[in-house]
Amino acid sequence: SYNLRLPGYHFDLEREIVGSIRYIEKRLAPEGKKVKLFLWTGDCIPGRNALVWTQRAGVMNMNGGDTLATRSLPTVTEVEGLGIEREGLFQVFAPNQNENVYTNEWRGPFYGFERVIETFEFTEQPRRLKPINIYFHTYLTTKVAGMRSLDKVFAYALAQEITPVFASDYARK
């Protein structure tokens, strides 16, 4: 399991979810701006209690899913749905996957994220199945190949005729 053992720390969903929201609103966001969307981290498989806490906090939630249709996997079975019901609550899946998936969990090839373009193209025709969503972690830019792949992905997206939508609006639909 991927975790950092911290002396004296005990996992608490309220602290993790509500505490994160409060921290962002008080210290990071512009004054008066409210958090609308909570993005799951790690394996992105929240339990029902985690979904309950986002609901109590008045925010939507998103991440997870494994849309990975590419030229080497050209099948709609590699396109995830909009999300999944978890014991009466709904988790919205991210439209596309991040670099971690395309780089074999950051083991390489580090240019692998450019393959998300194949996913964008596959889910575009004959009709749009998933929106273009550039979802990456900043560590991608620690490798030259990762930075170049990100440049390619942004260049591709900017060359498309798109309708911009905030992630919070996508999750609401």
Task: Locate the predicted segments by residue.
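Solvent-exposed, polar/charged alpha-helical surfaces in well-ordered, non-transmembrane soluble domains
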Residues: 18, 22, 52, 148-151, ...
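Structural alpha-beta junctions
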Residues: 56-62, 154-167
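Eukaryote-specific, cytoplasm-facing alpha-helical/coiled-coil scaffolding segments in long proteins
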Residues: 44-52, 76-84, 160-164
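Metal-dependent polysaccharide deacetylase catalytic core of the NodB/CE4 family, i.e.
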Residues: 1-49, 57-78, 129-133
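Short acidic, S/G/P-rich loop/turn micro-motifs used as interaction or catalytic elements
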Residues: 139-143
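Surface beta-strand/loop "capping" patches
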Residues: 171-173
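Alpha-helical scaffold elements lining the catalytic groove of polysaccharide deacetylases
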Residues: 2-29, 81-124
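Short conserved micro-motifs at the rims of enzyme active sites and ligand-binding pockets
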Residues: 73-74, 144-147
